[in-house]
């Protein structure tokens, strides 16, 4: 979900040719001319299909063994509806993996900005930087469309719907490791990555996240369809 141009699907298909892959992306905003590019990739490879639809409007009766999304959940307006719909798209025993920012930690990774009290106040303070970022990346409306629910609110939704779920807390170690190994990823995270490196060298990252239980900025949610 949120397959964009299909580049990741194309890469996965090259490594796992016997597995059937399918993408879902609404292309509603027109960001980066995704729809035109994805159609070109499909035509050249003819090995997977990208459905131009949101999850909420997806009409197929087909079910899947695995649904995954990376940095998509925070763009979904209605989290309970999204969780319910994706659960219904899973085969019995299927898995839905959601990787997204955890806004219980007051940091917004798309704009590399701290969150101050709430979304509106943050925008008032950082309006210039937010508008400049959207103009530079040609993603007008990105800030407005962000859903800043954190892990606590997501967990309440899951419990209210009596859904079988777990959080993979090891993602913290993998992301911290990636900051040290992936220069492009580190650069994209800006000042937050610098603080992470300093914290790691001073050994205070474990104090913050393990002992003091300060929320980690990212979360990996695993939902199982088990009846």
Where are the regions a protein language model picked out?
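Conserved beta-strand/loop positions that form the S-adenosyl-L-methionine
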Residues: 1
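Conserved glycine-rich SAM-binding loop
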Residues: 4
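Class I SAM-dependent methyltransferase SAM/SAH-binding core
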Residues: 7, 11-55
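Short conserved loop adjoining the S-adenosyl-L-methionine
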Residues: 57-62
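A conserved beta-strand element that flanks and buttresses the S-adenosyl-L-methionine
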Residues: 68
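A short His-aromatic
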Residues: 71-75
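S-adenosyl-L-methionine-dependent methyltransferase catalytic module, highlighting the catalytic core
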Residues: 77-85, 95-222, 226
């Amino acid at each position: 979900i949120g397959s964009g141009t299909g580049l990741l699907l194309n890469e996965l298909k090259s490594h796992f040719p016997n597995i059937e892959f399918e993408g879902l992306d609404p292309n509603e905003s027109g960001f980066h001319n995704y729809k035109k590019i994805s159609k070109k990739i499909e035509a050249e490879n003819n090995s997977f299909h990208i459905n131009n639809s949101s999850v909420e409007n997806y009409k197929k009766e087909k079910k899947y063994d695995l649904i995954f999304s990376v940095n998509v959940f925070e763009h979904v307006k209605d989290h309970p509806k999204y969780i319910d719909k994706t659960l219904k798209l899973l085969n019995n025993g299927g898995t839905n993996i959601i990787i997204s920012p955890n806004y219980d930690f007051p940091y917004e990774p798309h704009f590399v900005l701290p969150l101050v009290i709430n979304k509106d106040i943050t925008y008032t303070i950082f309006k210039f930087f937010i508008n400049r970022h959207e103009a530079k990346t040609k993603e007008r409306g990105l800030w407005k469309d962000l859903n800043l629910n954190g892990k606590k609110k997501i967990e309440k939704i899951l419990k209210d719907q009596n859904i079988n779920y777990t959080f993979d807390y090891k993602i913290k170690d993998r992301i911290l490791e990636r900051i040290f190994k992936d220069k492009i990823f580190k650069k994209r995270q800006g000042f937050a990555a610098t603080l992470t490196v300093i914290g790691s060298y001073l050994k205070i990252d474990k104090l913050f996240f393990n002992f003091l239980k300060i929320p980690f900025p990212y979360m990996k949610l695993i939902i199982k369809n088990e009846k």
